[in-house]
């Protein structure tokens, strides 16, 4: 419930520093010459545009497969990287409070309890919890048609009935069926 204000403040700071923020805009390619960026090509409501640029920061986020494919096709150096994949687990917040606080589970001022689990596997990988959301919610977060993605969130008060966390395993490039730089993405 505070994220909107944080994002707005970040955007305002970028603008104060002379940056630009473009909504309703999709980058289609980064143009370069002699190994240096020269421009960014994009599409907006007016059609395809080109913006001269000497430097570009791509804050791509998740599920930007088209962007990674375009950069790979343009010859941008890439290598496969490890990442984690898993599921969202959800349980009653009361249960977590009792497990963590014991007889003090109802003590005023303690708030919703959290937890973290981690195990190193003999294979060298790991299984762990991440983004534990006390008193939170499991939310749909797919950004592509046909995609199934979940995430978790807690309101500032952390007073929801349930808790949730991501339960993840580490995947290394050797685990991918395709050894290309985009092998993990296609898997």
Report each predicted region and the residues it spans.
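Residues forming the flavin
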Residues: 1-187
